[in-house]
């Protein structure tokens, strides 16, 4: 499996009050990104500071909605350790969706390693309160900058 390069955020965001969490409102300090092209496959795996994505205006995701997403949770156990809820099931569903819309499947070991490393790096975002969790939203988008119906 390829190495995942980590670039830490220089400034950390203020964490929300765990008693007032709102789904989808707060983003962690980092994100996991991997590039793909036919020649190299999935490459340049990295965890970087959370930031907007730069997308070509002709990207497939914008014109043909070529994208998929999944969702899983990281939560704290009674002893304070962090667990992911069924991460391999999540990765398999992600790849099944990729197959269905002709996006390249992400190697399972790479996806799991990226999610795991991201949660380790941003572990202070996983709340301690009962019935709370950190929601993780893996997604794959078609970025091929061409118009016309074909795979990205």
Where are the predicted features?
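Conserved alpha/beta cores of soluble small-molecule-handling proteins
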Residues: 1-152
């Amino acid at each position: 499996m390829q190495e995942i390069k980590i670039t830490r955020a220089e400034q950390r965001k203020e964490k929300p009050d765990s008693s007032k969490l709102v789904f989808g409102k707060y983003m962690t300090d980092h994100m996991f990104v991997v590039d793909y092209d036919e020649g190299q496959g999935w490459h340049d795996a990295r965890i970087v500071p959370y930031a907007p994505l730069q997308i070509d205006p002709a990207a497939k995701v914008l014109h043909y909605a070529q994208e998929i997403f999944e969702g899983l949770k990281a939560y704290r156990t009674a002893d304070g350790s962090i667990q992911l809820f069924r991460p391999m099931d999540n990765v398999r569903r992600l790849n099944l969706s990729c197959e269905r819309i002709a996006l390249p499947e992400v190697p399972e070991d790479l996806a799991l390693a990226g999610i795991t490393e991201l949660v380790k790096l941003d572990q202070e975002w996983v709340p301690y309160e009962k019935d709370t969790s950190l929601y993780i939203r893996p997604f794959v988008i078609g970025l091929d900058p061409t118009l016309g119906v074909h795979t990205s």
